[in-house]
Amino acid sequence: MSVDYGVIYNRVDRFLQTREGLANPKKASDYKWFVRELSGIFCGAAYEHNLSTESVVNFLDIVQPHCINGIVNTGKVSSVCDLISDHIKHDPLYYILERTLMLYKPASVQVGPGEFFMCFYDAGSVFGIDNTAGYDVVVDGTTTELKSLGTNLTTPEIFDKYAANPILQRLMVVKPVSGAAKPQSRSVYACIDVDKWRDAFYHRNGRTLAYKEGIK
């Protein structure tokens, strides 16, 4: 099935204008690059799965007003898909692009897994594209720092610095769905108030970030 890149490009552009920080004027030189990348992702997914241009546009239409609510903030390992409304999850593009959007880094912006995904699916989000903001994203109305499970780029000392940051409210650690053809589990996360991070996370051997609660 043929895909109309121009139609998808224009719809992606309009979509991104609704997400604060993703069309940040400070990064204006990167913005068109960003739109091209994301348009290419959607065109590729549609082509590979025999979906129409209209299917992509309709998906963006239903995601644009969507808000993420009810993030579990107790440190419990929870399913990311529970944060997404059923009518979106019933669209094949949600699962087709789950891993891609979890790992996607807009243009030249340095972000970690989950940051773009959360802002994509939350109309009220703020993408902390400025590295002096003191947080990665605002999602579900709360300033949030995101990290990836298993990363070796954090330490207890770094997390303690996060806890001392008066702007930052909570810490979220995500494990994106695997790239397997039939993954055994979908993306998960654990989230907790940043000053209680030791109740939910630890650093194996002092560096490798892990959940205290096992993944079921």
Language-model segments: residues:
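Nucleic-acid endonuclease domains
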Residues: 2-134, 142, 146-216
